[in-house]
């Protein structure tokens, strides 16, 4: 038995599909990962986005990021299943090594959420406080 490693998979599903079909495709993605020895830790469904360039005449894709632990020997079967799924336009599986995880922690530590008080300039904050007083 191999040691399970941490992976991140980004999937772009055809955005022209109905919401039910996108949800069904996401269920298939989860099932393929689980069937091939993967333990899903985190799923972030970003939703529909306009792509930078068309893929297979599609300009809108539904994006999802999945973090899972799996054996390296199971990746080939996962990739093959994704390639044969017509609803998946693109996918990328990346091994999250220790340096990558450390870099991610540093970025999260210093990142600012858009719309948070840290994101606003002093002028915006002053305008909001003046508006609140009125």
From Swiss-Prot:
GO MF annotation list: rRNA binding; structural constituent of ribosome
Keyword field: Ribonucleoprotein, Ribosomal protein, RNA-binding, rRNA-binding
Cross-referenced SUPFAM superfamilies: Ribosomal protein S6 (SSF54995)
Biological-process GO terms, alphabetical: translation
Residues in coiled coil: none
Domain of life: Bacteria
CDD domains referenced in this protein's UniProt entry, alphabetically: bS6
GO cellular component, one term: ribonucleoprotein complex
Function, in words: Binds together with bS18 to 16S ribosomal RNA.
Family assignment from sequence similarity: Belongs to the bacterial ribosomal protein bS6 family.
Protein name per the record: Small ribosomal subunit protein bS6
Source organism (scientific name): Chlorobium phaeobacteroides (strain BS1)
């Amino acid at each position: 038995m191999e040691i399970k490693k941490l992976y991140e998979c980004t999937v772009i599903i055809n955005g022209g599909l109905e919401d039910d079909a996108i949800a069904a495709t996401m269920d298939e993605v989860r099932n393929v990962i689980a069937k091939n020895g993967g333990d899903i830790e985190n799923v972030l469904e970003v939703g529909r986005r306009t792509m930078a360039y068309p893929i297979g005449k599609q300009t809108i894709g539904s994006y999802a990021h999945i973090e899972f632990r799996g054996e390296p020997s199971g990746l080939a079967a996962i990739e093959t299943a994704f390639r044969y799924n017509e609803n998946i336009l693109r996918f990328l599986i990346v091994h999250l090594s220790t340096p990558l995880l450390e870099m991610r922690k540093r970025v999260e530590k210093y990142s600012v959420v858009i719309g948070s008080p840290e994101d606003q300039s002093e002028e915006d904050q002053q305008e909001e406080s003046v508006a609140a007083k009125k």
